[in-house]
């Protein structure tokens, strides 16, 4: 709702007030009923700050409660009026401490006056309400009430204002009520209109009341304030007002002019509008106290006042029309209070107070007319005002809650911080106090022990003195000397103890000062940090502002650039349009030229079609000639085939004879192989290569004879070692002529000249690539078929001679190889050892693969079957036991195949195999780490009777002596075995060997893999050990750290410069500390005592004759130095401890030295002297 509209409505109302001269009569009761139905009154909470009446119950807040939000200073003689509730329609039950609102005469300037129905007043009343119209001013509160009798039942509509008939009826039925006034020890006031205030101003109290004066008069008219005070109505609530007496009739009250009322309403309207715009409530009473009449209507133009005359009322009236001041009469005589009641003869004025001020002028008794239009405007304005007040109240309450909540959170955080700081200081002081008490108790105990020892020595001296009397004077002198020495020692010892106690006290004082300084320093650092953060925030704010300024400047620059670019683009587009126009004209000219070229192409196409027709005719003629030529060639080929079949029969006979000779050669070679196997050198690779090549050549000799078509001499020469098959030259005149088909090549189809040139080039390249041919004497077929020496064919003799020569040459070569292998020169010996190492690698890999296959086929797969069928095993346990066995088996299979391939080739190269597989060997890490974990599970499996039977059956089926445990440990041992075998091969491989680099890199890779596996295994074991110790040691600190690992443990005795850290302990030695524990028989095996750090420690060997070592933590010149002397069970343990300590502390620059006991004593004395100084 716009506030300007509301202000315009106010101006219209003022104009109507000036123009109205006569007001019509209005039925106030029916209008009030309609208003109550349309706008039911909300049930707001009522706070009763007055003292409780004699019959009322105790309120929640008490008589002295003051709302802290609106509390202001108040005098001892006056207080804010208390709101009261009365239901005029029903007259229902009332609670204690609530009063009827129509118990006083409020004389203000009413815009509307209405009649209220008091007929339905048959309801019961609770305490605090009375049946008579009497008011008793007690020491605690003022109580008011009405008579609930049914004599007040006449409706306002039957009231005759001219004849006062209603008055006469009431005069006959109801006696005149009287008001008894007594002196109030505590002046209290009741705000009768606060219940009808707008929602935004509900429960708000104005305590800026003016001090009231007691006077004999019992009625005050606050409308005369304008005569005594300034016209500014804000000062009306700030300066004390002088009460004035009113006459017995309502006509004697002073009135204010309509002009003053309109001015006041305008000023208050403008002020409230200003506060509404600013979002803050006004400090003036017009903003905080919005008093409304009983039907919550806004001020309207002046209407005549409805007055009900009570013949029995007295001549005095008590008027309640000011929310901030209330007068209470104090007089020895009885005074009558005029109530707005039909039975009353006095004048009662009902005012309707608004939020812009009060018009306290009275009207004539006879004017009761009202304009119907003004009431419709009044209801509309009332709705607007209610909506505005509700909205304002919600916003104000929300802001107040947020403000209070922020302060509450701040105070809570501040209190928590102070409590935390106080708690830390108390804890520090408590620790210091406990430490001092412990130290003083320890010193007292030591002194008591020393006194007991001195007493024992005195007793011993007395006994010795008694015995010495018998011996003589010499013994007496000796005893005296001993006594003096003891006394002297006692005095020295006492001095030493006192010095130590003084030292401890000094140390404690120094520690306290250090703690205080540390706390002060910490607070200073925190303040500096806060200041720094504040500076940073300021600098960030400045930087942000500068950045915004820069961004704004850059944005402007960019906009200017964009404008320039747009101009350039427009210019470019214009130029582009010109270019497009030029291109368009050019394209039109090109189109004309293209049309001409199309016509020329059409003419050329027609000429080409004519030429193609002529060529087709020529091709058909050429095809016919080719068909005739093919027929002729087919006849020639058939004749040649017949002749070839005859020749093949002859060649078959010749091949059979050669097979018999080859069989003889194979038998001889088998004998030689058997002999070589029986020799001392077994499985030599060069020999195997040579034999395999001979066998292969012998097997391939018949096929080569067939391929060369009876070229016997050439096939025999091809069987020689280290010779390739020879293709004889065609120009040779000594080649046998097998058939005319081969001698005379068949006619071929004519080929284009380009293909013929390509074939010739290929033949020339083949001839260039061929090796030089060994010239072998050849014979013609006639010469070979000749019979010599009666029964032998010349060709057969030639063949036998050639075979014999080859056999002799081969035998000679074998003898040379044997001699070379049996020789003892270093080179041969090195080659032999290398071959043995390679062969061992292959044989062990083969055996390892066989073991993995047995483990898979006879244990892993059957166990999975049993787990599914008989539930003898669990699938989870099987997977844990065998881990990644399948992956390892696959790798071993591939390595075995590759080794077999490489061993069949000379020279043997195996290094690249392991270089290739080295990264894959990391899968062994999972198997190795899992092996120790599954050992207990596997043991439990084997101990089960059914499982034990299963494992024995599978072992018998596998026909292997090894059990499952031996098979499972093989993958763990395989990687170290690779390293040993490759190291042996590298040892026997010379640097100039082809395989040296690969073997070396393979050995280094496998070595790194083994180191990686061992490190991972060590980390897993160390973590398991740390977890075990964490569980065993009670109250132990956090042991599991990434850099920490366990070294050893031992029982020992410790002597330290702190007596509480001395005694017999059990030590756990880690790489960075020594954990001191004691054995315990309760919930854990060990109990944590303290820790000896090794970071800045110095390890010393006291003597070589004992089993003690000393650990010094810190510098000897420092006060906080710690010295621990550890006595180990034996010298052997001492040596092992020193060795481990030297290994763990050497990288940190700490050396372990050997010092004699005298040197250590001297250093301890120097340390004690430095402390005394």
Curated annotation (Swiss-Prot):
GO-annotated molecular function: guanyl-nucleotide exchange factor activity
Stretches with biased composition (Low complexity): 8-23, 35-45, 72-82, 98-118, 134-143, 153-191, 208-219, 240-258, 296-380, 743-765
Keywords for the protein's UniProt record, in alphabetical order: Guanine-nucleotide releasing factor
GO terms under cellular component: cytoplasm
Compositional bias per record (Polar residues), positions renumbered to this chain: 50-62, 119-133, 220-239, 280-295
Segments for region (Disordered): 1-380, 458-479, 712-765
Name of the protein described by the UniProt record: Rac guanine nucleotide exchange factor JJ
């Amino acid at each position: 709702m716009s506030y300007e509209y509301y202000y315009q409505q106010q101006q219209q109302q003022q104009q109507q007030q000036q123009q109205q001269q006569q007001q019509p009569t209005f039925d106030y009761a029916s209008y009030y009923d309609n208003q109550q139905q349309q706008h039911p009154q909300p049930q707001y909470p009522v706070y009763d700050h007055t003292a409780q009446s004699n019959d009322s119950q105790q309120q929640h807040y008490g008589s002295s409660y003051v709302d802290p939000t609106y509390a202001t200073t108040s005098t001892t003689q006056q207080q804010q009026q208390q709101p009261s509730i009365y239901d005029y329609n029903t007259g229902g039950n009332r609670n204690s401490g609530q009063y009827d609102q129509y118990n006083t005469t409020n004389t203000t300037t009413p815009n509307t006056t209405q009649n209220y129905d008091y007929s339905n007043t048959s309801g019961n009343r609770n305490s605090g309400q009375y049946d008579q119209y009497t008011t008793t001013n007690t020491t605690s509160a003022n109580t008011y009430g009405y008579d609930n009798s049914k004599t007040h039942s006449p409706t306002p509509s039957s009231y005759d204002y001219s004849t006062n008939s209603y008055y006469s009826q009431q005069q006959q039925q109801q006696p005149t009520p009287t008001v008894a006034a007594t002196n109030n020890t505590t002046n209290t006031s009741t705000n009768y209109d606060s219940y009808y205030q707008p929602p935004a101003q509900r429960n708000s109290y104005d305590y800026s009341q003016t001090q009231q004066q007691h006077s004999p008069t019992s009625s005050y008219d606050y409308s005369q304030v304008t005569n005594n005070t300034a016209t500014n109505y804000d000062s009306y609530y700030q300066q004390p007002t002088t009460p004035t007496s009113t006459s017995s009739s309502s006509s004697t009250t002073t009135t204010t002019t309509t002009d003053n009322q309109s001015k006041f309403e305008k000023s208050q309207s403008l002020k409230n509008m200003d506060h509404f715009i600013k979002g803050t409530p006004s400090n003036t009473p017009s903003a905080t106290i919005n008093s409304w009449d009983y039907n919550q209507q806004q001020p309207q133009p002046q209407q005549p006042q409805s007055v009900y005359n009570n013949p029995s009322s007295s001549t005095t009236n008590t008027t309640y029309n000011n929310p901030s001041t209330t007068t209470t009469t104090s007089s020895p005589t009885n005074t009558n209070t005029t109530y707005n009641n039909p039975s009353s003869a006095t004048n009662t004025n009902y005012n309707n107070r608004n939020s812009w001020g009060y018009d306290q002028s009275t009207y004539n008794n006879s004017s009761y007319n009202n304009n119907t239009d003004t009431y419709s405007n009044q209801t509309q304005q009332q709705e607007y005002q209610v909506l505005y007040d509700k909205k304002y109240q919600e916003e104000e309450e929300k802001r107040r809650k947020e403000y209070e909540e922020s302060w509450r959170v701040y105070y809570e955080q501040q209190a928590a911080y102070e409590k935390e700081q106080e708690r830390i200081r108390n804890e520090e002081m408590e620790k210091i106090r406990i430490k001092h008490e412990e130290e003083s108790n320890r010193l007292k105990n030591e002194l008591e022990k020393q006194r007991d020892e001195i007493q024992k020595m005195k007793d011993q001296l007395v006994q010795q003195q008694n015995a010495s009397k018998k011996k003589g004077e010499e013994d007496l002198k000796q005893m005296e000397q001993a006594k003096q020495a003891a006394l002297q020692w006692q005095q020295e010892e006492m001095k030493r103890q006192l010095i130590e106690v003084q030292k401890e006290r000094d140390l404690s004082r120094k520690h306290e000062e250090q703690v205080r300084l540390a706390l002060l320093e910490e607070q200073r650092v925190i303040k500096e940090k806060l200041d720094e953060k504040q500076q940073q925030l300021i600098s960030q704010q400045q930087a942000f502002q500068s950045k915004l300024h820069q961004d704004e400047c850059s944005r402007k620059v960019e906009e200017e650039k964009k404008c320039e670019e747009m101009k350039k683009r427009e210019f470019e587009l214009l130029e582009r349009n010109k270019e497009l126009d030029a291109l368009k004209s050019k394209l039109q000219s090109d189109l004309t030229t293209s049309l001409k070229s199309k016509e020329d192409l059409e003419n050329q196409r027609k000429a080409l079609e004519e030429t193609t027709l002529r060529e087709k005719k020529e091709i058909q003629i050429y095809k016919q000639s080719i068909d005739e030529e093919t027929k002729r060639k087919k006849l020639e080929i058939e004749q040649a085939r017949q002749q070839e079949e005859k020749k093949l029969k002859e060649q078959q006979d010749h091949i059979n004879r050669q097979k018999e000779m080859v069989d003889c050669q194979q038998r001889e070679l088998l004998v030689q192989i058997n002999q070589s196997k029986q020799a001392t050198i077994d499985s030599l690779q060069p020999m195997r290569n040579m034999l395999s090549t001979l066998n292969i050549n012998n097997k391939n000799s018949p096929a080569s004879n067939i391929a060369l078509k009876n070229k016997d001499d050439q096939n025999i020469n091809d069987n020689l070692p280290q010779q390739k098959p020879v293709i004889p030259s065609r120009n040779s005149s000594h080649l046998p002529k097998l058939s005319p088909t081969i001698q005379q090549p068949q006619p071929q189809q004519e080929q284009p000249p380009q293909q013929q040139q390509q074939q010739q080039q290929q033949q020339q390249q083949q001839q260039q690539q061929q090796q030089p041919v060994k010239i072998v004497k050849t014979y013609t077929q006639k010469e070979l078929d000749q019979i010599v020496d009666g029964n032998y064919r010349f060709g057969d003799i030639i063949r036998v001679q050639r075979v014999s020569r080859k056999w002799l040459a081969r035998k000679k070569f074998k003898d040379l190889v044997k001699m070379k292998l049996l020789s003892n020169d270093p080179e041969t010996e090195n080659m032999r050892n290398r071959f043995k190492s390679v062969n061992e690698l292959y044989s062990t890999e083969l055996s390892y693969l066989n073991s993995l296959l047995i483990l898979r086929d006879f244990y892993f797969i059957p166990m999975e079957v049993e787990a599914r069928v008989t539930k003898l095993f669990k699938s989870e346990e099987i997977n844990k036991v065998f881990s990644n066995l399948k992956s390892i088996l696959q790798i071993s299979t591939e390595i075995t195949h590759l080794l077999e391939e490489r061993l069949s080739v000379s020279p043997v190269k195996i290094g690249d195999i392991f270089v290739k597989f080295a990264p894959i060997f990391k899968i062994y890490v999972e198997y190795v780490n899992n092996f120790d974990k599954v050992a207990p599970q596997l043991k439990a499996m084997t101990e089960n009777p059914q499982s034990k039977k299963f494992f024995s059956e599978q072992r018998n089926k596998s026909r292997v002596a090894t059990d499952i445990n031996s098979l499972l440990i093989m993958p763990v041992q395989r990687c170290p075995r690779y390293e040993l075998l490759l190291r042996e091969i590298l040892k026997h491989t010379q640097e100039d060997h082809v395989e040296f680099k690969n073997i070396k890199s393979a050995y280094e890779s496998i070595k790194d893999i083994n180191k990686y596996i061992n490190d991972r295994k060590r980390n897993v074991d160390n973590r398991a050990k740390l977890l075990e110790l964490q569980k065993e040691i009670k109250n132990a600190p956090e042991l599991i750290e990434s850099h920490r690992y366990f070294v050893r443990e031992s029982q020992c005795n410790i002597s330290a410069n702190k007596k509480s850290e001395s005694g017999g302990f059990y030590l756990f030695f880690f790489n960075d500390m020594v954990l001191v524990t004691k054995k315990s028989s309760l919930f854990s095996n060990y109990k944590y005592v303290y820790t000896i750090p090794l970071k800045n420690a110095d390890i010393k060997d006291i003597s070589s004759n004992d089993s003690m070592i000393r650990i010094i933590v810190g510098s000897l010149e420092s006060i906080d130095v710690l010295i621990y002397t550890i006595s180990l069970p034996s010298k052997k343990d001492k040596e092992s401890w020193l060795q481990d300590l030297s290994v763990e502390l050497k990288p940190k620059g700490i050396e372990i030295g050997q010092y004699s006991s005298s040197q250590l004593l001297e250093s301890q004395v120097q340390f004690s002297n430095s402390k005394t100084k």
